[in-house]
Amino acid sequence: MAIYHATMKSFSRANGDSSVAAAAYRAGFDLLDTSTGLGHNYSHRGGVDFHQMLAPKGAPSWCFDAQYFWNANEAAETRKNARVCREVEVSLPHQLDPHQRRVLALALGQLLVERFQVAVLVAVHTPSKLGDQRNHHVHLLMSARKVGPGGLGERACAEFDARQGGGTRALRQIRKDIATVINAHLKNAGNAARVDHRSLRAQAQEAAR
């Protein structure tokens, strides 16, 4: 069984978060937040194996320019407590080689692009020297708004904020879909390992039947 880890978090201006800073840190960029004048230089940080911007078909070319896009993403949010982006972090199987992990990371990013019509920064990180050497993972930073031919539009991913359990169901579904993509890539690589998106408790209950 391969390691499965997939979590989602939100970034809010109310907490002092900036999507420009988040993008710079995750991809090892040197970005200037034009709304604050603050620079975020992580170009010398280690551990970033690969990065790429993804956007829906027909999106303007500037959506693939991290400096321009994430500043546009910030400018689109005017409220002091606005959510400026979301992130999905996913473990990448150590059973795959570096190229296979990059291809998988792009496939996961494309899943989010097509499902939610957002732009996504894909940033693959390698294990830290002193950490678990199986800890390959990808950060998938998602725009707060949908992206179309005209650029940034209406707010995206409202299903994750739904009440009465709707948000939990939406998160459970995307975790399941992520596991499906990972397992397809493991199978294509000729590896017998698989991931399971369910909790350890749910897996144990099924095994006990």
Predicted regions and their residues:
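N-terminal nicking endonuclease/strand-transfer module with a His-rich metal-binding environment
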Residues: M1-R209
